[in-house]
């Protein structure tokens, strides 16, 4: 059955972070590109919402290369606008909910909705929007995370903040390490708890590893053999 797809790609400042290989924003862009071309190759229509701290931009679903290129161009523009010197958006954490509300007004029934995000700021409102979407559509949540969320070094100091308020944390303090690890783990646990009521798939993708092999593993594809 041919059906349309909507890809929501998160390019907020929370995605502008990476300790190994990629920024989360880059991994999200790669996931979106791979998904868009695969969906188009199956003969389906592809559209999207590109989310940034400034808001979001919609790309209507079309069955054409031009539509995919337009979506990926918007993603590239949002990615290029990310900067450590960019001013903080106080309501950035709520932008995901606003984009999901817009998605609810776009999809009707029998759509595939792929949300590619670190789910920063996700809460009960997020779940409510996803529940409404999932009633008549298929939802996939691609959780993009950085290895540092689970691999906290035992020494050193890091500065964390939102661009306005900053604080230095001592990693030698076991309480600090536990809290940092819990932050990354809590998002995954929250999505797992949502999986059953949403009847949705969860794809945890690390920005610290190449994207394609991870997606192949998650979808159960056998590894390609090298030619002799």
Task: Describe the residue ranges of each PLM region.
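Exposed, interaction-prone extracellular/peripheral surfaces
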Residues: 1-30, 37-228
């Amino acid at each position: 059955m041919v059906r349309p797809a909507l890809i929501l790609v998160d390019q907020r400042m929370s995605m502008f972070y990476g300790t190994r290989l990629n920024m989360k924003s880059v991994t999200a862009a790669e996931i979106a590109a791979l998904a868009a071309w695969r969906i188009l190759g199956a003969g389906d229509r592809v559209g999207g919402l590109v989310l940034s701290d400034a808001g979001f931009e919609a790309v209507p679903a079309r069955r054409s290369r031009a539509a995919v290129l337009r979506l990926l161009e918007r993603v590239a523009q949002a990615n290029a606008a990310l900067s450590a010197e960019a001013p903080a958006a106080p309501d950035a954490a709520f932008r995901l909910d606003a984009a999901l509300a817009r998605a609810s007004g776009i999809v009707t029934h029998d759509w595939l909705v792929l949300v590619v995000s670190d789910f920063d700021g996700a809460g009960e409102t997020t779940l409510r929007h996803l529940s409404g979407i999932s009633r008549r559509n298929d939802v996939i949540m691609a959780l993009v995370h950085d290895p540092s969320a689970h691999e906290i070094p035992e020494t050193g100091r890091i500065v964390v903040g939102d661009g306005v308020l900053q604080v230095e944390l001592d990693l030698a303090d076991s309480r600090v390490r536990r809290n940092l690890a819990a932050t990354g783990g809590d998002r995954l646990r929250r999505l797992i708890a949502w999986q059953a009521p949403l009847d949705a798939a969860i794809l945890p993708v690390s920005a610290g590893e190449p994207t394609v092999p991870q997606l192949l593993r998650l979808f159960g594809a056998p590894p390609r053999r090298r030619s002799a």
